UniProtKB/Swiss-Prot annotation:
GO biological process, one term: D-glucuronate catabolic process
Listed EC numbers: 5.3.1.12
Protein name: Uronate isomerase
Pfam families named in the record: UxaC
Species whose genome carries this gene: Cronobacter sakazakii (strain ATCC BAA-894) (Enterobacter sakazakii)
Record keyword rRNA processing present: no
Amino acid sequence: MTPFMTEDFLLDTEFARRLYHDYAKDQPIFDYHCHLPPQQIAENYRFKNLYDIWLKGDHYKWRAMRTNGVPERLCTGDASDREKFDAWAATVPHTIGNPLYHWTHLELRRPFGITGKLLSPKTADEIWNQCNDLLAQDAFSARGIMQQMNVKMVGTTDDPIDSLEHHATIAKDSAFTVKVLPSWRPDKAFNIEQATFADYMAKLAEVSDTDIRRFSDLQTALTKRLDHFAAHGCKVSDHALDVVLFAEASESELNAILSRRLAGETLSGHEIAQFKTAVLVWLGAEYARRGWVQQYHIGALRNNNQRQFRLLGPDVGFDSINDRPLAEELSKLLSKQNEENLLPKTILYCLNPRDNEVLGTMIGNFQGEGMPGKMQFGSGWWFNDQKDGMERQMTQLAQLGLLSRFVGMLTDSRSFLSYTRHEYFRRILCQMIGRWVEAGEAPADIDLLGEMVKNICFNNARDYFAIELH
């Protein structure tokens, strides 16, 4: 019987252990996509307690707690921090088999140093006090944890109208060695069907000093904001394409669509597709000219529980996997961007694992320009961010493309404790390659495979995003 979560956790062959301990473990972290609040990094936020850093805003935990029968008051409601933590501690023993069980104990181990102890109602008091004592120390501030975890770069997620003042504050501090850069997330600028679209256009008009009436006005406003982001070091964009749409339109059609929507009219599905296509194609060309990377997160079905959406708002654990077809429309969108050789470096993520092979083969259609891995099939995302999901994504990438050119893991997280997800990924990667070697499916060449592992863990992302590190 193998003990739980030793130093060789998940490393079930000697070759996997060598790969992890000698090549993967000490690689820095290049976290190119996350949802950390830049204000907390700028202010070097000190966390009040373990709830503040660990449970606050974590919809993964809330979903598990609700499933365990925990009342909403103890998830997102007005209960005390300690009450909410105790509700989580009572839920953890029920999460065996869920990645939350592994994540929880990896996060207690690093950075808190808690090993050989499982979170449960019996241990809750001891773990609460031990972690809170550590959180009072300088090394456990927002910046302190990032430095402890050997983070070199994080890409936050930012709206085009954001001032980026916190990124500017961070950049001025030469004593802080982690590169914290904004990522451009323009969803509100192309989700024309949303009830908030006209209000958002007014905000965009104000911050860009542009009167937005025609499609060219929108392009002018967005160009000004792209320049603003570029001035703050931005090299990455991100888009939530819950459904992939494609429909071409003339400029006069786009002007009419925008004008009617700003006047409060309801658009047809075809008109919505025309507008979104035009914005994404134009943005893609802008990214290509600037040398940026674009990311498409495809296939979320959001806000399914309308009652809870009205009570609590978005992003609180009521989203799931969509099953809309995506191949043909995505192909048309990428091909349109590529017509004038203005398809930027692109990372595609799918929420439905059914679509893994679709994306794994789609990226092969648009590789080239002498750039290794220009088109990427992104790491297992959200509900696939677990052992089986990561294994499937990497196996299919290896079979359909080049695993050796993969840009690797990202946290996609709102928590400063999520950096151990990089460790989890690295262990799974080394386990997978070690099993190939054990089965005679890959050569037992530690130099060859060790270098490949180092590249996937850090070097490929560093080179792909072309961001100068401290």
